[in-house]
């Protein structure tokens, strides 16, 4: 009888230990851990019921102190392992909740980033719209900065007016290339003698090889928004999309620096 009781108890303890040793499969299978937890808790209750049944059947009749101590030790071990599994599952559950909380904060972080970079987003949107508008006429629009695109957009608006009015520059007269500008507040205009271009090339200088000496200048400024702007001179024909740096030939008595400055005044002239 004692042998049968010991075998039955050993089998019971082994089943409980096997249940308690069930491998939780991590955060991705939290539901499986909960199922394991349910089984362990149920097994623990079954263990108590089984112990009570064995008591009724005369478990107290066991006289061996050694056997009694071994049985109690095994039961304590089962309870300890079950308790440890409960703590492990609960800890992983808290970890899952914590990670879920972190994921819940992601939209807030995205909103913060979007707010901080709102100016960049607006700039990208404006640039994209201008590139789409200007690409038909300027195949290099995609490579230009937003500031350059804005200038081209303004020029296109003026060009449309010039074409409608039939305005076209002429190099036959000293002032034939100049546009009539209505005076505005703060307007600065160079003296008239500097605003008239030389007609013809009689007074221009040539190199030893017979080629005409040319000058060009890069004129840049910052507008009210801090954007860089470069002075480009459009073609005398408003239907063309050519833009060049202020350039021209050297006149007699001029060096490259003086010739370049004169061209800027002649072709720019108004500030």
UniProtKB/Swiss-Prot annotation:
Q: Which GO terms describe its molecular function?
A: hydrolase activity; metal ion binding
Q: What Enzyme Commission number(s) appear in the record?
A: 3.6.1.-
What does the entry's domain section say? The RxLR-dEER motif acts to carry the protein into the host cell cytoplasm through binding to cell surface phosphatidylinositol-3-phosphate.
Q: What is this protein called?
A: RxLR effector protein PITG_15679
What the record says about family reads:
In the N-terminal section; belongs to the RxLR effector family. In the C-terminal section; belongs to the Nudix hydrolase family.
Which Gene3D superfamilies does its entry note? Nucleoside Triphosphate Pyrophosphohydrolase
User: What positions does the record give for the motif labelled RxLR-dEER?
Assistant: 49-69
List the signal peptide residues.
1-18
What EC class is this?
A: hydrolase
Subcellular locations according to the entry: Secreted; Host cytoplasm; Host nucleus
Instruction: Report the residue ranges that make up the Nudix hydrolase domain in this protein.
Output: 212-271
How is this protein induced?
Expression is induced during host plant infection.
PANTHER family listed in its UniProt record: DIPHOSPHOINOSITOL POLYPHOSPHATE PHOSPHOHYDROLASE, DIPHOSPHOINOSITOL-POLYPHOSPHATE DIPHOSPHATASE
Read off the SUPFAM superfamilies from this record.
Nudix (SSF55811)
- Claim: Acetylation is one of the keywords in the record: no
Q: Where is this motif: Nudix box?
A: 248-269
A single GO cellular-component term on record: extracellular region
């Amino acid at each position: 009888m004692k042998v049968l009781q010991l075998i039955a108890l050993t089998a019971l303890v082994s089943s409980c230990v096997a249940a308690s040793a069930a491998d939780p499969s991590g955060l991705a299978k939290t539901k499986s851990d909960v199922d394991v937890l349910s089984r362990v808790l149920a097994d623990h209750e079954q263990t108590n019921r089984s112990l009570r049944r064995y008591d009724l059947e005369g478990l107290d009749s066991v006289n061996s102190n050694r056997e009694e101590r071994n049985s109690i030790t095994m039961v304590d071990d089962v309870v300890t392992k079950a308790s440890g599994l409960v703590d492990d599952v609960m800890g992983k559950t808290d970890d899952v909740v914590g990670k879920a909380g972190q994921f819940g904060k992601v939209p807030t972080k995205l909103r913060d980033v979007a707010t901080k970079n709102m100016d960049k987003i607006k700039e990208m949107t404006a640039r994209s719209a201008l590139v789409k508008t200007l690409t038909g006429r300027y195949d290099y629009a995609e490579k230009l900065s937003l500031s350059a695109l804005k200038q081209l957009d303004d020029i296109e608006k003026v060009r449309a007016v010039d074409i409608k009015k039939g305005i076209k520059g002429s190099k036959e007269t000293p002032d034939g290339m100049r546009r009539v500008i209505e005076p505005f507040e703060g307007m600065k205009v160079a003296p008239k003698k500097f605003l008239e271009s030389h007609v013809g090339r009689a007074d221009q200088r040539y190199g030893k090889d017979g080629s005409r000496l040319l000058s060009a200048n890069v004129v840049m400024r910052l507008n009210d928004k801090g954007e860089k702007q470069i002075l480009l001179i459009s073609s005398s024909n408003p239907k063309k999309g050519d833009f060049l740096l202020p350039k021209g030939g050297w006149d007699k008595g001029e060096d490259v620096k003086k010739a370049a400055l004169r061209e800027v005044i002649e072709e720019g002239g108004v500030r």
